[in-house]
């Protein structure tokens, strides 16, 4: 996939509940802005935007359809696969709020493939990914969320 410098690169995060303060979003934005040479669109999906710097685009946190009483456990990330998620299209990089960025991010957008996720080094024999950082084509995989919501018991 070649970089399209006319189109800003989508970089997103999610903040819900009280585990992370707005400062985590602000720091993440600052790290991204220092480590992107390309134009980017930074979007935070949250239910509380108080304290988040104005450069960050705020969108409502999507709901996840889980059976009543089910623990959330971070599954909310799967809502990025909703059809028309946040009005985003094209390559999108998801970053957890507690990642530390130490180098340029532009290469995440030039690697081939529609879905990229880090192999989980803790379980080298399993085919699992670490979802702290992953790149996907926005709007391309709604069946992932549909399947999870129908089979999450």
Stretch-by-stretch model annotation:
Residues 1-153:
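Glycosyltransferase catalytic domains, chiefly GT-A lineage
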């Amino acid at each position: 996939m070649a970089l399209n410098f006319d189109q800003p690169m989508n970089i997103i995060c999610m903040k819900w509940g009280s585990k992370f303060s707005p400062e985590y979003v602000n720091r993440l934005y600052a790290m991204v802005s220092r480590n992107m040479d390309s134009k980017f669109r930074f979007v935070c999906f949250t239910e509380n935007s108080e304290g988040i710097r104005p450069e960050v685009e705020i969108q409502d946190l999507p709901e996840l359809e889980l059976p009543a009483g089910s623990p959330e456990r971070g599954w909310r990330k799967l809502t990025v696969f909703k059809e028309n998620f946040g009005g985003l299209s094209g390559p999108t990089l998801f970053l957890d709020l507690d990642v530390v960025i130490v180098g340029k991010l532009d290469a995440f957008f030039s690697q081939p493939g529609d879905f990229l996720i880090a192999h989980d080094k803790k379980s080298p024999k399993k085919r699992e990914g670490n979802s702290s950082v992953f790149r996907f084509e926005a709007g391309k995989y709604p069946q992932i969320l549909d399947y999870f919501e129908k089979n999450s018991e």
